[in-house]
A protein has these predicted regions:
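Active-site groove signature of glycoside hydrolases
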Residues: 131-168, 195-203, 226-240, 301-309
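Acidic (Asp/Glu)-rich catalytic clusters
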Residues: 52-62, 80-97, 132-140, 182-189, ...
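Boundary/entry segment of secreted carbohydrate-active catalytic domains
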Residues: 25-75, 102
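Substrate-binding cleft/loops of secretory-pathway carbohydrate-active enzymes
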Residues: 202-227, 245-252, 279-294
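Substrate-binding cleft of extracellular glycoside hydrolase catalytic domains
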Residues: 79, 84-191, 278-286
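Structural preference for beta-strand elements that scaffold enzyme active sites
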Residues: 27-33, 64-68, 93-99, 142-146, ...
Length: 337
């Protein structure tokens, strides 16, 4: 047998039988999250039109496993809107994910730092109860809960112009803060799968960040009795070191997988506020996908197409190359080829 073929076979068998190797799905799970922030935040103009039987994203919908709903949208949505969303997603067989702050600190706390509405990443048990209750009342189930950047906003964040001050809480304090909020969701939806999103640029570069990421994953498992189900990477694409930071955090996440502290990794493919048109935003998102999975050979478990910026203004139709759902179709075509 050719020595190169033999070596390749041995390497493949080593991966198959390596007990520390993380499980990898045959194909990634596709998540979709149009912008849906309440005023004055941006929202896709056709967001609610997506949840009708003839909505023009049928191919994308048939291959989307998870629809991502944002906490700020859910706290202001009417019950009728939630009924419409849940009914349509159930009909399509698409699971619901909720991305929301979970560090249990109320608005304007006595400490003067953190808090719901002051700093991203925070929430309350009351907010969690409202979201869970109304999704359940609509006949729905939250399959995935995406904690909104608890490590960054709880531990590292200082303050942004016009925003509240960060608390610089210890990792142990953050773990204690998330527990009451997460308990609300797990009590309402016992099968809920809990993970998080973190901003890679603002994690990599912090002093001792690899140790902090490991300590955070340890603290989460100790607090909740199971490892983080997933980590989604929020990449600062326009920054000079944005991609390198993302790759560093991706590698750290793989280390967590090998240590059974993390189950799956996801990458958010999007544009940025620097992209001032729908066409520019979509092109950037496609370029980022090709960069990470083509050039850098990443194989994330979750592929997430998500926007929280003014573009793209439309989610549909999927035949419009400048609409968000067209990214799902483009990804499917790439996989087939």
């Amino acid at each position: 047998m050719n020595s190169k073929i033999l070596a390749a076979c041995i390497s493949a068998l080593a991966l198959v039988f390596d007990p520390t190797a993380p499980a990898r799905a045959a194909s990634p799970e596709i998540w979709l999250g149009p912008e849906e922030l309440p005023p004055p935040g941006p929202s896709a103009v056709d967001l609610m039109d997506m949840f009708t039987p003839d909505a023009p994203w049928k191919t994308a919908a048939a291959h989307t496993q998870v629809f991502l709903l944002q906490g700020p949208f859910l706290t202001r949505a009417t019950q009728d809107q939630l009924n419409t969303i849940v009914t349509d997603l159930k009909r399509r067989g698409i699971a619901i994910a909720v991305a929301v702050g979970v560090m249990n600190v109320p608005h304007d706390p006595p400490s003067g730092c953190g808090g719901l509405g002051n700093v991203e990443g925070y929430g309350t048990v009351q907010q969690a109860a409202k979201i869970a209750r109304e999704i359940k009342a609509a006949g729905g189930e939250i399959k995935y809960l995406v904690m909104d950047e608890p490590l960054y906003y709880g531990h590292y964040y200082t303050q942004a112009p016009g925003k509240g001050a960060g608390c610089h809480s210890s990792i142990e304090q953050i773990a204690k803060l998330i527990k009451p909020t997460l308990d609300v969701y797990t009590q309402t939806f016992p099968n809920i799968v809990i993970g998080e999103v973190e901003p890679t640029f603002f994690i990599d570069g912090q002093a001792n960040w690899q140790s902090d990421v490991s300590s955070w994953a340890d603290a989460y498992r100790e607090t909740m009795g199971k490892p983080l189900a997933f980590l989604h990477l929020d990449v600062e694409w326009p920054l000079a070191n944005g991609v390198q930071d993302a790759l560093a955090v991706y590698n750290a996440a793989q280390d967590l997988q090998h240590r059974n502290l993390l189950e799956k990794i996801g990458v958010i493919y999007n544009g940025s506020r620097a992209d001032k048109s729908d066409a520019a935003w979509i092109k950037a998102a496609r370029d980022h996908l090709l960069l990470m999975e083509g050039q850098h050979k990443l194989r994330p478990d979750h592929v997430i197409f998500e926007s929280w910026t003014p573009n793209p203004t439309h989610a549909m139709p999927e035949t419009d190359p400048n609409a968000l759902t067209s990214l799902v179709d483009a990804y499917l075509n790439r996989m087939r080829n």
